Amino acid sequence: MEKYYCSVSVSPIRAEVSEKSEMTSQILYGETCEIIETEGLYSKIKMDFDGYEGWVNSSVLKKEN
């Protein structure tokens, strides 16, 4: 799978595909993840650090070189 990293200082990880959904965690600048699926403006990610899964705005993710 392709690896992605967070390109902003901090971004919420949400339980559902919505800005109004509960924030269950955060992804910090430079932390890496895999994209499991994409829906609209959001991507469901799995964090490399701890395996945590949730939804983030796709615009904060950049593909690793």
Please identify what each model-predicted range represents.
Residues 1-10, 17-18, 22-34, 39-65:
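Boundary regions of SH3-family modules and the immediately adjacent low-complexity/disordered segments
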